[in-house]
């Protein structure tokens, strides 16, 4: 009964929102728009609660009225969650595809999700609209629709933008995006849209390296659908020959409005990465002081830390060496999180291996200091919760080195 009620409620809402007229019409339309029934729009959906919805979503809508009319969405954000999806995503081998289907099915999905949906009708000539539609149809063919997803440079937002720019360039025109006062790095953009998901941003900060800290151009900012919407709203189309300008967007509509942003609440401070890291640091200091006082070494604790750091190091080095994802090839976290961390987890139990363990801990201290120096010099930005974890590793390594030197290990 509740499902039926919800279904009919959504249908009623769609009946209202689909009948809404444009909230604003700013630009002067092209000369032949009134005689042509083909309309092309950029669709932008506000962020949702799932990880893959945090940045919002973009798609293309193409409509034609008349007896042969249609209302289609060209959606570049479709993927298959197969058994090996996680492995492929980690390797950077994730394939997305362009799906074409009735726009109403697309809209109802976001209505039920509670995400606001915007439509920006593009101010294109008849020839440009036809060329763009033809390009989208060719792209949607079975042999062309699959593409290698890149979350920064080739995603559901950059693809529609690029198709529009290509259609214009074929007709001797190009898009000029209005400049902005402030540009951000990729890491700053990810942190902004993932602000309520502290563990997600913490993991991204660990996994992605120095490239994420380069300042993105305004064009590169548009991998975020909401920023693409803003850029298109202020953009103009310039004719290469006459230098005549017109607005890229002729009308903006709000197809569905949600008063509640469907984003999860922030992580409680006591469950945040920083709180957990500080707790681990406090435990480490307590155990280390007890080791100093009793003259013994808590091998069990070093084993636990070593196993966790080893597994983290395996992931980091896999991303650095094997992954095709952007911003993974140069990562300073590889200095203090390495697969070699398994050594302090195992070697202290073998007396003859103590010199090797001391060698590892000595090198670890040097690498941690190098990591801190490079971060302080601005080579790479790191999450603040990393510092207590680095301190944990440093304290245990220094503890082992001093214990070995004083020959206090029993």
Regions picked out by a protein language model, each given a short descriptive name:
Residues 26-33, 250, 404:
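Membrane-proximal intrinsically disordered regions of secretory-pathway and membrane-system proteins
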Residues 78-170:
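A cross-kingdom signal targeting lumenal/periplasmic-facing segments of multi-pass membrane
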Residues 138-346, 352-357, 361, 365-410:
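Activation targets extended, charge/polar-rich intrinsically disordered C-terminal tails
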């Amino acid at each position: 009964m509740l499902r039926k009620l919800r279904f009919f409620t959504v249908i009623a809402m769609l009946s209202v929102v689909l009948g809404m007229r444009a909230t604003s019409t700013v630009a002067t339309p092209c000369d032949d728009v009134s005689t042509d029934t083909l309309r092309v729009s950029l669709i932008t959906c506000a962020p949702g609660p799932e990880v893959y919805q945090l940045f919002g979503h973009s798609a293309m809508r193409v409509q034609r009225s008349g007896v042969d009319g249609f209302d289609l969405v060209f959606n570049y954000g479709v993927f298959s969650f197969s058994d090996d999806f996680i492995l492929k995503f980690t390797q950077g081998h994730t394939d997305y595809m362009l799906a074409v289907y009735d726009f109403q099915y697309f809209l109802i999905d976001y209505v039920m999700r509670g995400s606001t949906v915007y439509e920006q009708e593009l101010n294109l000539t008849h020839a440009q609209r036809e060329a763009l539609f033809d390009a989208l149809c060719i792209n949607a063919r079975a042999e062309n629709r699959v593409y290698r997803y890149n979350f920064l440079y080739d995603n559901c937002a950059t693809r529609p933008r690029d198709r529009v720019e290509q259609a214009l360039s074929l007709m001797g025109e190009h898009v000029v995006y209005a400049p902005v006062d402030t540009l951000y790095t990729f890491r700053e953009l990810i942190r902004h849209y993932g602000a309520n998901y502290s563990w997600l941003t913490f993991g991204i900060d660990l996994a992605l390296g120095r490239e994420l800290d380069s300042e993105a151009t305004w064009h590169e900012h548009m991998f975020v659908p909401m920023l693409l919407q803003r850029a298109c709203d202020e953009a103009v189309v310039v004719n290469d020959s006459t230098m005549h300008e017109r607005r890229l967007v002729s009308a903006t509509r709000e197809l569905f409005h949600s008063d509640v942003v469907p984003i999860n609440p922030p992580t409680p401070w006591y469950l945040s990465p920083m709180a957990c890291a500080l707790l681990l640091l406090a435990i480490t200091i307590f155990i280390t002081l007890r080791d100093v006082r009793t003259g013994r070494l808590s091998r069990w604790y070093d084993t636990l830390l070593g196993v966790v750091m080893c597994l983290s190091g395996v992931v980091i080095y896999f991303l650095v060496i094997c992954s095709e994802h952007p911003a993974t090839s140069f990562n300073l976290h590889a200095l203090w999180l390495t697969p070699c961390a398994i050594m302090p987890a195992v070697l202290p139990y073998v007396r003859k291996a103590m010199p090797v363990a001391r060698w590892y801990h000595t090198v670890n201290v040097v690498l941690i200091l190098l990591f801190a120096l490079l971060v302080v010099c601005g080579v790479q930005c790191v999450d603040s919760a990393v510092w207590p974890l680095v301190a944990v590793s440093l304290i245990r390594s220094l503890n082992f080195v001093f214990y070995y030197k004083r020959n206090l290990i029993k």
